[in-house]
Amino acid sequence: MTNRFKVILLGILVGIVVLLANPAAANPSKQSIQSSIVKVMATHNHPDYQSPWQRKGINSVTGSGVIIGQQRILTNAHVVADQTLVEVQREGYGNTYTADVEFVCHSCDLAILTIDDESFFKDAVALEIDGLPELQSRVAVYGFPTGGETISITEGIVSRIEVDYYVHSSDRYLLAQVDAAINPGNSGGPVISNGKIVGIAMQALEQAENIGYIVPAPVINHFLDDVKDGQFDGFPELDIYVQLLENKALRQSLNLPKNSGGLLVTG
C-alpha cells in the first residue's frame, strides 16, 4: 500500500509540475479570456452597385474580435467589409490602435486583423481554437454589443448544427445555432466552451428570440490553415446544381425505387 501511495502521489506531483510549467494546458480563467476580447471600430464606404460611378457614403460600425496568436485578431468579414479605417481597443485601455486587414474571406464571413504596435497585445492571452462543439454543450458569447461600453457575456447551449446560408455572402457552409443572445456589435466575438474558441458570433434571426448563429471551429480552422502560406485561396466549390428527390412523381419518372432518396444533378 505504501509503494502504491507513493506512485499515486508522485503522479499527482508530476501533473501539477506540468500544469505549472505549461499554463496553456489549463483552461484560462474568465479574466484571461476577457483580456483577449477586442472592440473593433470600422469606417465603411460601400460601393453603390446600381450607380457604380459613386459610393453610398461613409458610415461607422462597431463589432468584436478575439486575439488568437501571432499577434492576430480574428473577426467577421462583414465588420470590416469595404473599410477605409479599422481601429481596435481592449477593455480597460484608453488607447485605440489602427489595424490592417491581413486576410478576408467574405464567403465564410471571417477576417484577420494585424497591428504593428506590439504594446496593444501586452498581458493579453491568445485563445486556442477547439473543434466542433457538441449539441447541448454550454457556450459563452463574448463581445461588445450595443447597450453598453464594457464586455458583455451571454450564455446558452448549442441547439443545432447544420449547413445553411451565411447572410453576408449568401453561401452555404457549416454553422451552429446557439440560444445565447447575439446582438448588433457581437459580430466577430468569440464563442467559448471550456476556455477555447468553438465559434465566432456571426448573425441572428430577427423574427425570433435567442436564435443566433456562429461560424464553427472547423470553418475557422480551414480558413486559418488556408492562409498559412501567406495567401488566401478560398473554399473549393462543386459547380453543380442539384434537386432533392423528394417528389414521388419525379422518382417514378426516373424509374427509381419507391422509397429511395438522393439528389438529382440538374446542371
Language model regions located:
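N-terminal secretory signal peptides that target proteins for export/translocation
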Residues: 1-5
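Bacterial N-terminal signal peptides
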Residues: 10-19
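N-terminal activation segment of mature serine protease catalytic domains
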Residues: 24-76, 85, 134, 223-226, ...
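C-terminal cap/linker of serine protease catalytic domains
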Residues: 28-32, 40, 117, 121, ...
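Active-site region of chymotrypsin-like
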Residues: 36-42, 48-55, 116-126, 152-209, ...
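Conserved active-site neighborhood of the chymotrypsin/trypsin-like protease fold
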Residues: 46, 69-151, 184, 208
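Soluble non-cytosolic domains of exported or imported proteins
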Residues: 62, 130-134, 148, 152, ...
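Conserved hydrophobic positions within beta-strands
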Residues: 65-67, 99-101, 158, 265
